[in-house]
Amino acid sequence: MSEYLLLLISTVLVNNFVLVKFLGLCPFMGVSSKLESAIGMSMATTFVLTLASILSYLVNQYLLLPFDLGYLRTMSFILVIAVVVQFTEMVVQKTSAALHRALGIYLPLITTNCAVLGVALLNVNEKHDFIQSAIYGFGAAVGFSLVLILFSAMRERLAAADVPMPFKGGAIAMITAGLMSLAFMGFTGLVK
């Protein structure tokens, strides 16, 4: 049990996919200007990342490995992710049209979010079992969501702040992301 808790804490804080592994930077910078959009994207990404991680594990264990089709791993994982994203988009469109409009192009772009594919591939490389794969996917999603929501809240405050002209927009966003990354480096000794 403690092994699973350590894996979760490690994935959320210590080895955060955005700030440590630099995966998922496109939605991190693109959707983080408004807190409402960031929360919606976080929920959608959490669902997609967790489900895609579990399904990728199952595809790998029960299709690719038994038939010695390891060379199709990346392509099959992308297909799994695309199916999960399409399912998520249909659910979001039916349940919340406003959220669907707010997320815009970023919802279908979860398919190409390298963090989602990265989690699936790292699950295989690190030889996680089913429960570890689910926890790793969920932890990566929670870490992504945490960073995205914190960053979007900071960007909203920065939009109202008196920032010098050369630093407005993307420049101050990159500086803020760098400072967040430094803050998350403080968690490095938390899990060994």
From Swiss-Prot:
GO biological process: electron transport chain
GO cellular component, one term: plasma membrane
Top-level taxon of the source organism: Bacteria
Enzyme class: translocase
Pfam family, one: Rnf-Nqr
Cysteine disulfide links: none
Subcellular location(s) per record: Cell inner membrane
E.C. number(s) listed in UniProt: 7.-.-.-
Bilayer topology: Multi-pass membrane protein
Residue spans crossing the bilayer: 5-25, 39-59, 65-85, 102-122, 134-154, 171-191
Key words of the record: Cell inner membrane, Cell membrane, Electron transport, Membrane, Translocase, Transmembrane, Transmembrane helix, Transport
Family: Belongs to the NqrDE/RnfAE family.
Function summary: Part of a membrane-bound complex that couples electron transfer with translocation of ions across the membrane.
Quaternary data: The complex is composed of six subunits: RnfA, RnfB, RnfC, RnfD, RnfE and RnfG.
Protein name per the record: Ion-translocating oxidoreductase complex subunit A
Taxonomic classification: Bacteria, Pseudomonadati, Pseudomonadota, Gammaproteobacteria, Alteromonadales
This protein's encoding gene: rnfA
